């Protein structure tokens, strides 16, 4: 659809060339000083409005940019998935077994809370020191 619009615009430009001369034609009665002062047009906003319409504001370009960004993100996710899959396959090939998970209630503490004699004696083994400082 876009190519049809572009071709119609190009055809219109070829068939209807713009007149050569000043940008805004001046009537014969005012052709004196006014034509010399405002050679590019007699409206004060001509200079202010020139170039104000940005190409980036076009909805088609925004849509294309968002599609490109979505494609980049998709490619990154695809690469990350491939990397993760290759890591998992490498672990399976090595015969790595994931640890078995047990409920926390089955675990017992590594030391018996009633047997604290080792903690009291550890400071007294040092020569001439205060056991509480070590």
From Swiss-Prot:
Protein's cellular compartments: Secreted; Cytoplasmic vesicle, Secretory vesicle lumen; Cell projection, Neuron projection
GO molecular function, one term: neuropeptide hormone activity
Predominant subcellular localization, coarse grouping: secreted
Signal peptide (from-to): 1-23
One Gene Ontology term from the biological process aspect of the record: positive regulation of respiratory gaseous exchange
Start-end of Polar residues biased regions: 119-134
Propeptide stretch(es), residue numbers: 54-134
Spans annotated as Disordered: 98-134
Gene Ontology annotations for the cellular component aspect, listed alphabetically: extracellular space; neuron projection; secretory granule lumen
InterPro entries: Bombesin
Keyword Nucleotide-binding on entry: no
Keywords noted in UniProt: Amidation, Cell projection, Cleavage on pair of basic residues, Cytoplasmic vesicle, Mast cell degranulation, Secreted, Signal
Modified residues (Methionine amide): 50
Family, similarity comment: Belongs to the bombesin/neuromedin-B/ranatensin family.
Function recorded in the entry: Stimulates the release of gastrin and other gastrointestinal hormones. Contributes to the perception of prurient stimuli and to the transmission of itch signals in the spinal cord that promote scratching behavior. Contributes primarily to nonhistaminergic itch sensation. In one study, shown to act in the amygdala as part of an inhibitory network which inhibits memory specifically related to learned fear.
Name of the protein described by the UniProt record: Gastrin-releasing peptide
Organism: Ovis aries (Sheep)
Gene that this sequence comes from: GRP
